């Protein structure tokens, strides 16, 4: 009986040692990852709105509160990190006017961006008879009459960072790019096809992660 008790005690002691050894190894791995992360100090991706081709931008209704628009934009993203990759798990692009969304979101396919890599996307963003707030409808009509409309091209999504073989959890990504559309002078753009106008911006965007 005594031998059985000693055997059971030794077994429990061995299990405890194995358990704490595993905890210690996991702690060392976690600490190593944190140190690598702190040393590398990942930087946010840099976005530039290169251009926008306007195919349609019409306000209708009485009062004017229905907006139909169709753009194709060119958006570039650069990973400034030397040793950190970026996974874009989701990225939805859309346009806003005075903080109100005026187009449907367009999803960009998930992609991986390596060190110092640059990706360029050219999605279409559009909306058909999108209701806008009455005061925004009046302001939009006025801005068009004055010749210039300021839109904000936004991209919202989620990213993950890759350090070596370690991949972080998901982080929210928010991108805002100002786009001044000059309706009063089409000479500022390039005529594309029958009635589309392409405007070049090379505008740096604000990025938050």
Swiss-Prot record:
InterPro entries: LEA_2 (IPR004864), NDR1-like (IPR044839)
Free-text function comment from the UniProt entry: May play a role in plant immunity.
UniProt source species: Arabidopsis thaliana (Mouse-ear cress)
Protein name per its UniProtKB record: NDR1/HIN1-like protein 1
Compartments in which it is found: Cell membrane
GO CC annotations, alphabetized: plasma membrane
Tissue specificity of this protein: Expressed in rosette leaves, cauline leaves, stems, and siliques, and at lower levels in roots and flowers.
Stated induction or repression of this protein's expression: Induced by infection with the cucumber mosaic virus (CMV-Y and CMV-B2 strains).
Gene that encodes it: NHL1
Transmembrane spans: 18-38
Glycosylated residue positions: 58
Recorded superkingdom: Eukaryota
